[in-house]
Curated annotation (Swiss-Prot):
The organism's place on the tree of life at top rank: Bacteria
Protein function: Chaperone involved in the maturation of iron-sulfur cluster-containing proteins. Has a low intrinsic ATPase activity which is markedly stimulated by HscB.
Organism expressing this protein natively: Shewanella putrefaciens (strain CN-32 / ATCC BAA-453)
Keyword Mitochondrion found: no
Molecular function (Gene Ontology), one example: unfolded protein binding
InterPro entries according to UniProt: ATPase_NBD, Heat_shock_70_CS, HSP70_C_sf, HSP70_peptide-bd_sf, Hsp_70_fam, ISC_FeS_clus_asmbl_HscA
Protein's GO biological process: iron-sulfur cluster assembly
Family per similarity comment: Belongs to the heat shock protein 70 family.
The protein's name in its UniProt record: Chaperone protein HscA homolog
Length: 620
């Protein structure tokens, strides 16, 4: 999947064709699908005009019901109507059964300890249930867009582990759908608001969904989202608001112990009341009992706020802890993005604004913001926005390397390498006793640093003070699936290391890439000559420095005539090294090497004599 329409110099790129891709928010309570059409990003509605699909699946003897149809039967058939399946993804049956929450489902255990739902159609696992939710979303997208999808971007919570992420991918694989990328929900929300285009700053993502609350603090720097800290409560969400309202109505109506069906009916009404109070100061709750009698009560916004206030305060406390973990204050947060339908609750917005000291971003529907960000990402990944700074490449367009002595570039990852990729190379010290090494990461095809693009600099300290060339520093370049480059330098004997992250594609357009490639061709011969000269100059400096140290220590092993000849040759090497004749420098170094071979042998003999002085043969 080529994302950049790049051609070699002198050739033309193939005509651009719009590729179909969508973003999917596979949510705990509701799921959505979004796409970029004619430059506009929006969620796609179903035939009834509904954008969100309830993440509910009901299994009957003959059919599988998904979404609103399944929700209608949830009160009458809770055992076979699976809601919030996302909570089961990647978790063991033991974890689920030992948790505080009880479920109406009948479980079985798989061979590897994962939960299986017992249904009229047999045993099904959370991955299969998730696939049933994805199925109508994919069908909706292909019907609306008029063709087969090239792939999808699916969002996942930032805290999802590898097993949960793999389960999400597997759900799509069951449908034969290609997953372009799994995108963290906080990052998707930030992308939807275009925050990725800002140079730098701290962003908070306040995500209060149906089943969970997540607060993520991100630092944006040159297109790279760095997660500073995450927090929240995996058992706090809009569902809990519903449960509190349900219990309140149950107490007011003096219902006492109720069965599963009535509890589900009350819960559905509580959710309706909660949504009504978003725009109204009061509303009427009403249910019809099995005997046909009707119960009514007026619920005010003040009543609702009083019920949920302790839970909202818990979310703010989580924000405070997470900011502390991130090492930033509320005043340093540039923007707060609201995600999740429960952030529509007025009290939530009021408390968030009071805590962060500024109104949160709410112009994009909080239920849809994650799906919209995923759609923007998907559109880029299939190559529909080649000029985007958010470009996430599946191949590396320009080589990545490190600066070495003399301003030379040592390429570590070559251009057109597919990602993700990791490459490592060993470097060593230039001087005796060197305890630190500065690294300069560059991008480009030219031979000298001056002609390449500077990406980042960092320093490795704590290198053992050894002779020049004795220390071994392993430098690893790792580019992940999102095009994020991590460079790590580690001294092998001690394990000390330092690293940095950078996004090579930030601020880089197709035109700039093409220009850099053309220049590398145009100046190839000249660059090679300049590199050869620089290499010989570096070698001359290394040889002269080493020889100066040797003469200072063991110069008395030479007579005056020998010392004079060596000094003269060294002066000649130093003089030639300031010029531009690489071959002359090379020959001068070779003459100096020949001239000092006898001196090197004497030094070796002398070192052996000193080492064995005073020792008997028996001790050797």
């Amino acid at each position: 999947m080529a994302l950049l329409q790049i051609a070699e110099p002198g050739q033309s790129a193939a005509p651009h064709q719009h590729r179909l891709a969508v973003g999917i928010d596979l949510g705990t309570t509701n799921s959505l699908v979004a796409a970029v059409r004619s430059g506009e990003t929006a969620t796609l509605p179903d035939e009834d005009g509904q954008h969100s699909l309830p993440s509910i699946v009901r299994y009957t003897q003959d059919t599988v019901e998904v979404g609103a149809l399944a929700a209608l039967s949830s009160a009458q058939d809770p055992k076979n109507t699976i809601v919030s399946v996302k909570r089961f993804m990647g978790r063991s049956l033991t974890d689920i059964q030992t948790g505080e929450q009880s479920f109406p489902y009948e479980f079985a255990e798989s061979e590897n300890g994962l939960p299986l739902f017992v249904t009229p159609q047999g045993l099904v696992n959370p991955v299969q249930v998730s696939a049933e939710i994805l199925r109508p979303l994919i069908a909706r997208a292909e019907k609306t867009l008029g063709g087969e999808l090239q792939g999808v971007v699916i969002t996942v919570p930032a805290y999802f582990d590898d097993a949960q992420r793999q389960g999400t991918k597997d759900a799509a694989a069951l449908l034969g759908v290609k997953v372009l990328r799994l995108l963290n929900e906080p990052t998707a929300a930030a992308i939807a608001y275009g925050l990725d285009s800002k140079q730098e700053g701290v962003i908070a993502i306040f995500d209060l969904g149906g089943g969970t609350f997540d607060i993520s603090v991100l630092r944006l720097n040159r297109g790279v989202f760095e997660v500073l800290a995450t927090g929240g409560d995996s058992a706090l969400g809009g569902d809990d608001f519903d449960h509190l309202l349900q219990e309140h109505m149950q107490q007011v109506w003096l219902l006492g112990d109720i069965d599963v069906q009535l509890r589900r009916q009350l819960l559905i009404e509580a959710r309706r009341v909660k949504e009504a109070l978003t725009d109204a100061n009061e509303t009427e709750a009403r249910i019809i009992l099995a005997d046909g009698s009707e119960l009514k009560q007026v619920v005010t916004k003040r009543d609702f706020d009083s019920l949920i206030s302790p839970l909202v305060k818990k979310t703010i406390a989580s924000c405070r802890r997470t900011l502390r973990d991130a090492g930033v204050t509320a005043e340093e947060v540039l923007e707060t993005v609201m995600v999740g339908g429960s952030t529509r609750v007025p009290l939530v917005r009021e408390q968030v604004e009071a805590f962060f000291g500024k109104p949160p971003l709410t112009s994009i529907d909080p239920d849809r913001v994650v799906a919209i960000g995923a759609a923007i990402q998907a559109d880029i990944l299939v190559g529909n926005k080649p000029e985007s700074d958010l470009l996430l490449l599946d191949v590396i367009p320009l080589s990545l390397g490190i600066e070495t002595m003399g301003g030379l570039v040592e390429k570590v990852v070559s251009r057109n390498t597919t990602i993700p990729v990791a490459r490592a190379q060993e470097f060593t010290t230039f001087k005796d006793g060197q305890t630190a090494m500065a690294f300069h990461v560059v991008q480009g095809e030219r031979e000298l640093v001056a002609d390449c693009r500077s990406l980042a600099r960092f320093t490795l300290k704590g290198i053992p003070p050894l002779a020049a060339g004795a220390a071994h520093i392993r430098v690893t370049f790792q580019v992940d699936a999102d095009g994020l480059l991590s460079v790590t330098a580690m001294e092998k004997s001690t394990g000390v290391q330092s690293s940095i992250q950078v996004k090579p594609s930030f601020g880089l357009s197709d035109t700039e890439i093409a220009t850099m490639l053309k220049d590398s061709m145009k100046y190839a011969k000249d660059d090679i000559s300049r590199r050869m000269l620089a290499e010989q100059q570096v070698e001359a400096a290394r040889v002269l420095e080493s020889l100066h140290a040797a003469l200072a220590k063991d110069g008395d092993l030479l007579n005056d005539d020998e010392r004079g000849q060596i000094d003269a040759t060294m002066a000649n090497v130093a003089q030639l090294a300031t010029g531009d004749d690489a071959e002359a420098i090379k020959q001068a170094i070779e003459r100096l090497d020949e001239q000092t071979q006898d001196f090197a042998a004497r030094r070796m003999d002398n070192s052996i004599r000193v080492a064995f002085k005073g020792q008997s043969i028996d001790n050797i």
